[in-house]
Amino acid sequence: MAVIDTARLVPWWKEPTKDQWLAWVAAWLGWTLDSFDFTIFLLIMVPISQEFGVPLTDVAVVFTITLWMRLLGAVCSGWLGDRVGRRIPLMISILWYSLCNFIAGFAPTFWFLFVFRALLGFGMGAEWPAGAALAMESWPIRSRGFMSGVLQGSWGIGFLLSSAAYGLLYTSIGWRGLLWLGILPALTVVYVRYFVKEPPVWVENRRRQRAENREVRMPLFSIFKRGMIGNTALACWWMAGGLVTYYSINGMFATHLQKDLGFSPAMIATPIIFANLVVFLSSGAWGFAGDRIGRRWAMIIPGLLGIPVAFWYMLSDNYWVIVIGFVVQGALLGGGAGSQVPSYMTERFPTEARATAAAFCYHLGTILGGIVPPVITYFAVDHNLGFSRPMLVGCVIGAASWCLALFFGPETKGKDMVPDLVLA
């Protein structure tokens, strides 16, 4: 007698339970608002440089240190998430980065701003591993790739919101007021505290660790054990390529439009708003593809297509070529290439080290990604190359590396997340 898959008899959005939806929304809110607090800084680097009388390269270093601090925050959050649950580090991280951004808006000196933006990086890094593990462990296999794309693409929604705030409010509230808006995400903590539950797979895994006296006390070390280190190294390579690509495209884009081309705030905000809307929509579309053609190819294909697009618009000074090219890139190296990051990263590692592994591999990539803005600024300003050519070089190298790492990586489409003890 044939076994009927009852889950496929209902629409995919009805398959998840209420608790699964609540968990996913928590991760979505955390990531979207994380993006808002982080990307607002990309739009106000020039006025910060002017107000404090520091070189633009120094302001770009603030951006770099923020990214580097993400690794420390991520590893701490990953360890805490694997030990006590996904909810607690998620709440701490959201409250942390909200307060730091708000306080940075009162900066009396450049170094005050530097310190609190660096501390913001710690909280930012702590959000992603906790949120990704919470969402992906809670979600059914059938549509996990699609919802991974929607989740990761929500970074584009946060960037869209920060761009809209910049375009509409900058002239009236200035760069300080834009940083003060960063306190609003703190309200999400109330939602997570009262409505979100831990994923059952994590709860059962922790129960087994205790019952069998096989607790994994240092999950970071376990992902470098024999049999795991190759997977870990490939995941780090993958994320390094991806984040070098992302920050080559986006890190100094607004500054390029301001300094090299003299565009107004509204002209700068327009391509960023539309591109990030496309990032969100295309992430869902490529996520849908990931549930059918596999996680890797749903990222490799847009990654390869994005390289010639970069040559087309990055070297142009025509406003509409830049707008159209940047928006198209949002569907490729923006939303498409990153659509499967939450699902693919979490599916690669066992439950007892999932948050830690995701934290380390993803945010090791931010170390290299964080070098990109000051390097681009150095060549653009000190060598009078302008921003477009260094941005293009970083984009091409990063995208090619990203695709190679994915090609050699494992395929995880359809993989179930189980509470079995693998590393203990």
Question: Model segments located where?
Answer:
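Helix-loop-helix hairpin linking two adjacent transmembrane segments in secondary transporters
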Residues: 151-194
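Cytosolic juxtamembrane N-terminal segment immediately preceding the first transmembrane helix
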Residues: 1-36, 41
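C-terminal transmembrane helical hairpin of 12-TM major facilitator-type secondary transporters
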Residues: 296-340
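Conserved MFS/SLC helix-loop-helix module at the cytosolic interface between two early adjacent transmembrane helices
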Residues: 72-108, 293
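Cytoplasmic helix-loop-helix junction between adjacent transmembrane helices
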Residues: 116-153
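Helix-breaking motifs and short loop linkers at transmembrane-helix boundaries and internal kinks
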Residues: 53, 85, 106-112, 140, ...
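Extracytoplasmic gate region of multi-pass secondary transporters
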Residues: 42, 229-280, 369, 373
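Central cavity-lining transmembrane alpha-helices of secondary-active solute carriers
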Residues: 64-77, 273-285
